[in-house]
Every structure is written in structure tokens, then in C-alpha cells.
């Protein structure tokens, strides 16, 4: 359901940007570090939206990679803790069995 809402919001946002871009079709002057040029406002708007989406996508990918690394570390720690717990449990059982065997030998 969450993915459906994401798609719906993305479509609404795309529609709003498209309408806004189509309404603003005149040329505008764009200043670069090395010069100036005239561009249709629709291209400036769409280029800005695409650059913003690229930045958000890059940050999102970085966050996902960071979380995957953290999950891998936590799973490794979890496995280590489980093995230690099993070893402790087996040692306790062995001690109990040894103690029971010693008591039976004394009797």
C-alpha cells in the first residue's frame, strides 16, 4: 500500500511540474560561470527538476547502502551472540551432567 501512495504522489508531482512547465514557455537568460545563453523556461524547469531528482536519488542510494552495511554488521553480531549463548548452554548442560554422574558414582 505504501508503494502505491508513492506512485500516486509521484504522478501528481509530475503532472504539476508538467502543467507549470507548459504554462511557462518563454525564453529566459541563464548565466553560467563561463557565459550566458537563452533557454526556453520549460527546459530550465525540467532540468532543475531532473537535477533535484538525481540529487535525491544519490542521497537515497547512499542511505540504502549504509543501512545494508549496518544490517550485515548486526546480523554478524547476532550470529556471534547466538553461538556464545549456545556454547554457554552446552557448557551448563555438560556441567550438570558431570555433576549428576559424580553424584551417581558416589552412591
Swiss-Prot record:
Keyword Cell membrane in annotation: yes
Membrane topology: Multi-pass membrane protein
Record keywords, A-Z: Cell membrane, Membrane, Transmembrane, Transmembrane helix
Region (Disordered): 82-107
Keyword Transmembrane helix: yes
InterPro entries: LapA_dom
TM helices/strands, residue ranges: 5-25, 42-62
Protein name listed in UniProt: Uncharacterized protein YrvD
Organism: Bacillus subtilis (strain 168)
Amino acid at each position: 500500500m505504501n508503494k502505491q501512495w508513492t506512485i500516486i504522489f509521484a504522478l501528481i508531482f509530475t503532472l504539476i511540474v508538467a502543467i507549470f512547465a507548459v504554462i511557462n514557455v518563454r525564453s529566459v537568460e541563464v548565466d553560467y560561470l563561463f557565459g550566458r545563453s537563452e533557454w526556453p523556461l520549460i527546459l530550465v524547469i525540467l532540468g532543475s527538476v531532473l537535477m533535484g531528482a538525481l540529487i535525491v536519488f544519490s542521497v537515497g542510494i547512499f542511505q540504502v547502502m549504509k543501512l545494508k552495511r549496518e544490517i550485515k554488521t548486526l546480523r554478524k553480531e547476532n550470529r556471534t551472540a547466538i553461538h556464545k549463548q549456545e556454547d554457554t548452554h552446552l557448557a551448563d548442560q555438560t556441567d550438570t551432567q558431570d555433576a549428576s554422574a559424580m553424584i551417581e558414582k558416589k552412591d
